[in-house]
Amino acid sequence: MGIDINHKHDRKVRRTEVKSQDVYLRLLVKLYRYLARRTNSKFNTIILRRLFMSRINRPPLSLSRLARHMKKPTREGMIAVVVGTITNDVRLYKVPKMSVAALHVTEKARARILAAGGEILTFDQLALRAPTGAKTVLLQGRRNAREAVRHFGPAPGAPRSHTKPYVRTKGHERARPRRRSNV
């Protein structure tokens, strides 16, 4: 008598192609698919995988965080690679000179990087400059920085839970008859 093996959970849950209809993103996917296949470098495979990701999994990286990572002495003259958006940070007073490759850079962040004597590359320019990812630093923003993530975890009210409850309002005595002070 045979064993009935259940294959219900066998699928691997990850994207194998880009979901977006953006033609420019699809062109980049074509390019990095080629590079990942033809070069024996892990860098291109990682870039390709990150290009497939949803926007939630490609969080923005602030200019101050980028500067902090690139200021390390071992990263002198390297290109910062961000598969996502680089945003401005007004708390950062002085932007260091650096080379950055990103999918998108906000207007003010772009102006500040260029004013500091840095350069901003697109991913097709990066493919020409560093086809195997030599002299590059792969960076990404914090995925758990979203406000929505605060609501995830053990139920609010459970012991040692720091999960934020979903409430519309806070602090008013909502039961009827309300106190005169809240009228």
From Swiss-Prot:
Entry keywords, A to Z: Cytoplasm, Ribonucleoprotein, Ribosomal protein
Keyword check for Cytoplasm: yes
Residue stretches of biased makeup (Basic residues): 161-183
GO cellular component: cytosolic large ribosomal subunit
Major subcellular location class: cytoplasm
GO biological process, one term: translation
Keyword Membrane on entry: no
Location within or outside the cell: Cytoplasm
InterPro entries referenced in this protein's UniProt entry, alphabetically: Ribosomal_eL18, Ribosomal_eL18/eL18-A/B/_CS, Ribosomal_uL15/eL18, Ribosomal_uL15/eL18_sf
Similarity comment: Belongs to the eukaryotic ribosomal protein eL18 family.
Name of this chain's protein: Large ribosomal subunit protein eL18
Natural source organism: Spodoptera frugiperda (Fall armyworm)
Gene expressing this chain: RpL18
